[in-house]
């Protein structure tokens, strides 16, 4: 408990306020006493101790002054009690509230003992005071009132006894001892009074609230003390510090007491007339001198005792004055005490009220705390639940975020792996390029070295040719041999070229095959993309079809709701008819009561009671039927709730089945069959709905017929009322009977129609049973399909959608069945209403018979009225009433016409509303068609976007090759393609079926429009018929009124043939003129007696007239009441309609909310499906990339093999060059041998000069060949590796070999460079 919540704090506030109020009053009353105390304290502070040396002189002066002023002391002593009176009575009220006692250390027990002892010691105290005054010579008492404290402290009992003993002794001996004891006794109360004066302000606040009872007791005790002990008031205690100070204080107090008493003595000395003014002035001067001397004197013990004795001598006068003054003051004090007690009682009451308020506030605070604690607990629970939900949601978000991060990390890892692999491939390509460049550089260096060597050889050969021109013949033979070797080398080179061409053709074939494979893969990829697009389009088409089916279901639900509202309106109309019948029954009961009052027939009353009992039973039956309908509605609401729960369960199952997203083509044909059966069922349901609409329209017409019959009955009842008031003829009764017969026939026709309707309902129930059987078979088939789907998980989503559709169709069928049941109940209620109407018609027949009897009785009564004046007046009144009735009828006819128009207008408005609803439905369907077209366009756009996305994915596939681990075979791809093609065909068929459904719906809308126009024409024809009927009835009524007027005129003319009135006048004016002339005729012929008789009869007629008027007024009041009841009923019906509309709106809102939730769940499903598809696409892309990576690796391996083959070719070529080099060495050796032979034959050449010419010719040819070789070597940068150091062979033999070798080397180098360039280009393309 905190401080502000504790009850102590609440209790302390009012107590503090009360203490503050008391302190305020106490301080206000205590101001005089407080001023006196301040003055006394100042006086005490001004006392100055005189010197001891001047005591004797002062004593002498005091003795002289006492002798001189002896008389004055007596007069002054008389005034001392008055001073006491003024000092005690003025602050008495304030002194009573001083809280602190004299002895602060005393306990409550000692205080009680002292209060008891005060009463006993009052006489002893008086004696003690007298004895002390006689015995003591030192004035040791201060004149102060005892009422300064609440409990005056009397002397203890031991001290009182000692004082009594000392009083018996001599004064002279024991004076000093008594003075010492008095000083000791006075010390304690004086000290206590100092404590009180110092702590008075602080203790007043706390003491007032605690000791109110003690203050009240002490007030009464102090008053008693004032009455009984006047001398004690003059002897209060003061503190005494030492002997000198006591003396000075006594003198000071005596002077203070004498000053006011002297003034009073001067006022009272007016009685002493003998004294002279001069003596008074001298006495005043002496008294002033005496006062001054007292102020400066220091008394001894003897002198003080003398002063006390003189004062005691004057004490008798003081007692008398005190008694006189106290008597006047007691009444004032008592009055003040009473007022203060009243104030205290009022303050106590206020305190009690404040305590009660505090208690109430505490209770309210406790209740509010409890409420707040409950609210806080609820809020804490709510906050806890919200925090839990928030934590769960955060955990879900965190998990999803972690999953996304994991996916991103995986994707980054894949990218990094791809980049690493790409870098590795680039490195390998660089290595290969470096190797190729190194090989080319090496070949070029070798060729350049060989060319240099060849040049050197050519120079040497030229020199040798110049020297050895004579040896050409032998060289010719050698040339032939060399030519043969060259031909062999050429053949070998041709074979090498053929092998190179074969290698190139093999490489080209491999590249062509690789390109064809790539093209095949690209075509397959394009086909797959097309398949994906087709699947996407199929899914979108299926979604669109689902949405269309949902929209159709919503339309069906809305139409059912509209039908329910129409049926409710029909029920309301039936209730209105029943209420109108009840009102008519009430009117009939009132008529019966009036007739019973006139005829006093008990039999009629009993019959009426029976009828009322029967009608009460019927009402109870209707109420029971209404209760059953309400129970049925409650059961329907429970069924709706069950359906909603089923929907939620189905949604949960849908979420479970979403994981199984793989599709297969095994159940496609079965799905198509199911869809066809569903379409057939939808057509059947539409036919049933149309039949129900026709039935509702027929029942509406039947209700209209019943309402018209009810109106006709009401009009007939009104006719009966007017007939009773106007005494109609028997023809009217016959007409009523005919009308009743016609109504019986109509009721029979209605019963027949109801029977036919029941037959139709039975047939429809059979149809519904057949549909149920079909649905049961379909559900079984669906269950079988589920069993199949456990093995084959494909097309699960489609089957689930079909299940949903089947469930929805079952729900629709159930709703149709419920509607049929409701219609059966309505038919039963209508049959009950028909029976009630039959009973009412029978009752009306009985009432008509009773009315006929009553009319006969009234005719017998009216036949007694024979005299002319009564007849005239009666006829005039009848004519007036007829006029009023005619006017009322005209008004009623107009009102009925308006009512009929109003009745027709709401029906017309209902039909118009129906037409508008149909038009709105047509517009909705058109809007849906437009939406479908827009959806198709959107789908085409989506396809384009998907194609673009596929292109983008292709680009991504090139980056994600290494993630592909497995690739499906071509057979699986073909199966998938065939399945997708089948799905595409199915979707096309569905599109065609949807288009046919749209066209069928358009045809239906056109038919509905035509029907609406026909209904409008039928309404117009019915309105015309109603207007014609109204006109006919008004004409008939006017003719009837005119016939009655003519009959009345003829009657009057027959009665008074002498009276003549012009016939051109109106009926009312004609009656007035006829009345005046008839009165004139009767006045001339009648006698006094006849006049009296006539007057008597006139009075009777007037009484009858008044009675009839009263009855008319009653009927009018009844009609007004019925109209008011009808208006109230209409209002109640309108209110109920508004309530039902509100409920319908709420149900529609609930349905919309459910639809929105369903659409949201569908969107989530679509989103999940798309995510699954994306995952599948990514998986496929991964597989495709892995396949491509494998292909790239295969290509890489092929390239490596090709490079190896090229290296092998290079090695073979090098081997061939080495062989040619060895052959060249061998030929050099042969040339050396030939040189030796040439040296041998050199001698022979000198002889053969004839042959030198030939050699010269050969040399010329050799020079030409050498020039050609030099030109070829300068053009080409290739040469032979053969080094011929010392060759004696002629240049004509070596030149063709060099040429052939250089040509072959150049060709091989160019071919190798081309191959390397092609390899580099392919690698760059792949990267």
Swiss-Prot record:
Biased region (Basic and acidic residues) positions are: 73-86, 111-135
Q: Where is this region: Disordered?
A: 49-181, 197-216
Q: Record's InterPro entries?
A: Kinectin, Rib_rcpt_KP
Residue ranges that the UniProt entry lists as topological domain Cytoplasmic: 1-8
Q: Where is the composition biased (Basic residues)?
A: 163-173
Where does the protein end up?
Endoplasmic reticulum membrane
Transmembrane ranges?
9-29
Gene that produces this protein? Ktn1
Q: Which residues have a glycan attached per UniProt?
A: 69, 1031, 1066
Specify where it is mainly localized.
endoplasmic reticulum
| Similarity remark | Belongs to the kinectin family.
Its cellular-component GO annotations read:
endoplasmic reticulum; endoplasmic reticulum membrane
Q: Name one Pfam family in it.
A: Rib_recp_KP_reg
Tissues with expression = Expressed in all tissues examined including 12-day embryo, adult heart, brain, ovary, kidney, lung, small intestine, spleen, thymus and pancreas.
Any single GO BP term: protein transport
Say yes or no: keyword Plastid present.
no
Q: Which GO terms describe its molecular function?
A: kinesin binding
Where Phosphoserine occurs along the chain? 75, 77, 1060, 1290
Here the disulfide bonds are none
Coiled-coil intervals: 329-1327
Keyword list, A-Z = Coiled coil, Endoplasmic reticulum, Glycoprotein, Membrane, Phosphoprotein, Signal-anchor, Transmembrane, Transmembrane helix
UniProt name for this protein: Kinectin
Q: Which residues lie on this side of the membrane: Lumenal?
A: 30-1327
């Amino acid at each position: 408990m905190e401080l502000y919540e504790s009850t102590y704090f609440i209790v302390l506030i009012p107590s503090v306020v009360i203490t503050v109020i008391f302190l305020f009053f106490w301080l206000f009353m205590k101001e005089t006493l407080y001023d006196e105390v301040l003055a006394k304290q100042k006086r005490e502070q001004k006392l100055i101790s005189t010197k001891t040396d001047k005591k004797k002189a002062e004593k002498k002066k005091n003795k002289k002054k006492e002798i001189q002023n002896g008389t004055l002391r007596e007069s002054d002593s008389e005034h001392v009690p008055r001073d006491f009176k003024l000092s005690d009575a003025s602050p008495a009220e304030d002194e009573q509230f001083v809280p602190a006692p004299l002895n602060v250390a005393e306990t409550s027990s000692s205080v009680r003992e002292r209060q008891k002892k005060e009463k006993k010691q009052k006489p002893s105290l008086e004696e003690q005071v007298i004895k002390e005054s006689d015995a003591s010579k030192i004035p040791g008492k201060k004149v102060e009132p005892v009422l300064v404290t609440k409990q005056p402290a009397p002397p203890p009992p031991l001290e009182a006894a000692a004082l009594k003993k000392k009083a018996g002794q001599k004064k002279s001996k024991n004076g000093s001892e008594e003075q010492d004891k008095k000083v000791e006794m006075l010390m304690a109360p004086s000290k206590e009074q100092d404590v009180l004066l110092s702590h008075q302000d602080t203790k007043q606040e706390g003491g007032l609230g605690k000791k109110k009872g003690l203050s009240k007791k002490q007030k009464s005790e102090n008053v008693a003390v004032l009455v009984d002990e006047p001398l004690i008031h003059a002897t209060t205690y003061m503190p005494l510090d030492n002997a000198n100070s006591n003396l000075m204080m006594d003198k000071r107090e005596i002077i203070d007491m004498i000053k006011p008493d002297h003034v009073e003595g001067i006022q009272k000395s007016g009685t002493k007339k003998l004294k002279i003014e001069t003596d008074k002035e001298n006495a005043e001067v002496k008294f002033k001198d005496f006062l001054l001397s007292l102020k400066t004197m220091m008394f001894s013990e003897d002198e003080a005792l003398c002063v006390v004795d003189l004062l005691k001598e004057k004490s008798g006068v003081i007692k008398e004055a005190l008694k006189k003054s106290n008597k006047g003051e007691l009444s004032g004090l008592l009055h003040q005490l009473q007022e203060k007690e009243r104030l205290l009682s009022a303050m106590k009451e206020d305190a009690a009220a404040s305590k009660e308020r505090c208690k109430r506030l505490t209770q309210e605070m406790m209740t509010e705390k409890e409420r707040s604690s409950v609210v806080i607990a609820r809020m804490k629970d709510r906050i806890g639940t919200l925090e839990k939900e928030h934590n769960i949601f955060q955990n879900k978000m965190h998990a999803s975020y972690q999953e996304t991060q994991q996916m991103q990390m995986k994707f980054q890892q894949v990218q990094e792996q791809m980049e690493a692999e790409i870098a590795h491939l680039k490195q390998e390509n660089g290595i290969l390029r470096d190797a190729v460049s190194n090989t080319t550089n090496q070949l070029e260096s070798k060729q350049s070295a060989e060319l240099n060597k060849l040049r050197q050889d050519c120079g040497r050969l030229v020199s040798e040719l110049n020297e050895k021109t004579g040896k050409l013949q032998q060289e010719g033979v050698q040339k032939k041999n060399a030519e043969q070797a060259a031909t062999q080398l050429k053949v070998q080179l041709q074979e090498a070229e053929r092998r190179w061409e074969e290698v190139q053709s093999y490489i080209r074939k491999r590249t062509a095959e690789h390109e064809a494979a790539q093209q095949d893969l690209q075509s397959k990829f394009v086909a797959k993309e097309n398949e994906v697009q087709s699947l996407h389009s199929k899914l979108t088409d299926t979604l669109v079809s689902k949405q269309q089916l949902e929209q159709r279901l919503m339309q069906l639900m809305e139409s059912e709701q509209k039908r329910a509202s129409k049926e409710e309106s029909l029920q309301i109309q039936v209730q209105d008819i029943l209420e109108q019948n009840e009102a008519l029954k009430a009117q009939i009961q009132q008529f019966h009561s009036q007739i019973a009052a006139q005829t006093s027939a008990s039999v009629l009353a009993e019959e009426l009671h029976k009828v009322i009992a029967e009608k009460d039973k019927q009402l109870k039956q209707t109420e029971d039927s209404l209760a059953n309908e309400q129970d049925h509605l409650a059961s329907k609401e429970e069924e709706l709730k069950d359906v909603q729960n089923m929907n939620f369960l189905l949604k949960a199952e849908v979420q479970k089945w979403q994981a199984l997203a793989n599709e297969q083509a095994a159940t496609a044909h079965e799905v198509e069959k199911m869809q066809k059966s569903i379409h057939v069922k939808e057509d059947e349901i539409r036919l049933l709905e149309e039949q129900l609409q026709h039935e509702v329209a027929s029942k509406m017409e039947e209700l209209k017929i019943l309402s018209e019959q009810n109106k006709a009955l009401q009009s007939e009842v009104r006719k009966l009322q007017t007939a009773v008031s106007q005494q109609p003829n028997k023809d009217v009764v016959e007409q009523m009977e005919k009308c009743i017969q016609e109504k019986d026939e109509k009721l029979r026709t209605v019963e027949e129609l109801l029977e036919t309707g029941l037959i139709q309902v039975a047939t429809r129930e059979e149809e519904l049973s057949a549909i149920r059987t079909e649905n049961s078979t379909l559900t079984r088939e669906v269950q079988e399909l589920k069993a199949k789907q456990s093995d084959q998980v494909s097309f699960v989503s489609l089957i689930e959608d079909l299940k949903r559709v089947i469930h929805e169709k079952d729900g629709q069928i159930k709703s149709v069945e419920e509607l049929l049941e409701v219609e059966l109940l309505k038919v039963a209620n209508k049959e009950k209403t028909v029976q009630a109407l039959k009973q009412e018609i029978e009752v009306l027949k009985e009432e008509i018979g009773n009315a006929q009897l009553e009319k006969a009785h009234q005719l017998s009564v009216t036949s007694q009225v024979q005299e002319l004046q009564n007849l005239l007046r009666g006829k005039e009144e009848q004519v007036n009433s007829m006029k009023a009735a005619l006017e009322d009828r005209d008004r009623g006819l107009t009102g009925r016409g308006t009512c009929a128009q109003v009745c027709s207008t709401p029906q017309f408005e209902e039909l118009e509303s129906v037409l508008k609803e149909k038009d709105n439905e047509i517009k909705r369907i058109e809007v849906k068609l437009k939406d479908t077209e827009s959806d198709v366009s959107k789908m085409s756009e989506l396809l384009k976007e998907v194609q673009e996305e596929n292109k983008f994915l292709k680009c991504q596939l090139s980056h994600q090759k290494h993630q592909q681990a497995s690739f499906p075979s071509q057979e699986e791809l073909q199966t998938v393609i065939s399945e997708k093609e089948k799905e595409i065909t199915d979707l096309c068929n569905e599109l065609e079926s949807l288009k046919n459904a749209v066209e069928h719906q358009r045809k239906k809308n056109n038919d509905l429009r035509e029907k609406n126009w026909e209904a409008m024409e039928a309404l117009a024809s019915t309105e015309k018929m109603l207007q014609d009927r109204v006109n006919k009835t008004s004409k008939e009524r006017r003719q009837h009124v005119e016939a009655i007027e003519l009959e009345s005129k003829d009657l009057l003319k027959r009665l008074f043939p002498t009276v003549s009135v012009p016939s051109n006048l109106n009926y009312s004016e004609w009656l007035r003129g006829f009345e005046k002339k008839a009165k004139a005729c009767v006045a001339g012929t009648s006698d006094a007696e006849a006049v009296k008789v006539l007057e008597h009869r006139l009075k009777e007629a007037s009484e009858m007239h008044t009675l009839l008027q009263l009855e008319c007024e009653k009927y009018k009041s009844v009609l007004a009441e019925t109209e008011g009841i009808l208006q109230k009923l209409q209002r109640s019906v309108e209110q109920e309609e508004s309530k039902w509309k509100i409920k319908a709106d709420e149900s529609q809102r609930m349905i919309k909310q459910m639809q929105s939730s369903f659409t949201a769940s569908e969107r989530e499903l679509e989103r999940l499906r798309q995510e699954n598809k994306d995952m599948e696409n990514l998986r496929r892309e991964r597989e495709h990339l892995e396949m491509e990576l494998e292909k790239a690796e295969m290509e890489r391996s092929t390239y490596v093999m090709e490079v190896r083959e090229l290296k092998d070719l290079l090695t073979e070529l090098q081997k061939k060059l080495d062989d040619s080099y060895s052959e060249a060495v061998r030929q050099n050796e042969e040339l050396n041998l030939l040189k030796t032979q040439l040296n041998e034959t050199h001698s022979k050449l000198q002889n053969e000069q004839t042959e030198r010419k030939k050699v010269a010719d050969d040399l010329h040819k050799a020079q030409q060949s050498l020039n050609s070789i030099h030109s070829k070597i300068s053009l080409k940068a290739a040469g032979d590796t053969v080094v011929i150091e010392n060759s004696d062979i002629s240049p004509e033999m070596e030149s063709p070999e060099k040429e052939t070798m250089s040509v072959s080397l150049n060709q091989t180098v160019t071919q190798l460079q081309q191959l390397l360039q092609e390899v580099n280009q392919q690698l760059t393309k792949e990267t």
